[in-house]
Amino acid sequence: MGSRFFLALFLVLLVLGNEVQGTQEDDPSSPALLDTMQESFFSYWSSARAAAEGLYQKTYLTSVDEKLRDMYSKSSAAMSTYAGIFTDQLLTLLKGE
């Protein structure tokens, strides 16, 4: 029993003495996929926004500006109404009433 005890103790100490290592990454300094996608999305968004602002500044007319503001206010009011209806329907569906 003495040799088995020492053998078991040796194996336990050997296991505890070794570090548990995960898989090694090829390049730990490379950015994550989500960061890369987020950066590309933000670059596309900023370029599209800059193009839209440039087009707006180039073709600025007061009548068009008034129409755009009116259209925005009406569409945002409609979207808030439809969002409220959708939220109400979703809550009713989840409650089961």
From Swiss-Prot:
Compartments, record wording: Secreted
Encoding gene, per UniProt annotation: Apoc2
Keyword Signal: yes
Pfam families from the UniProt entry: Apo-CII
Annotated spans, Lipid binding: 63-71
Physiological role: Component of chylomicrons, very low-density lipoproteins (VLDL), low-density lipoproteins (LDL), and high-density lipoproteins (HDL) in plasma. Plays an important role in lipoprotein metabolism as an activator of lipoprotein lipase.
GO CC terms: chylomicron; high-density lipoprotein particle; low-density lipoprotein particle; very-low-density lipoprotein particle
Protein name according to UniProt: Apolipoprotein C-II
Post-translational modification, as annotated: Proapolipoprotein C-II is synthesized as a sialic acid containing glycoprotein which is subsequently desialylated prior to its proteolytic processing.
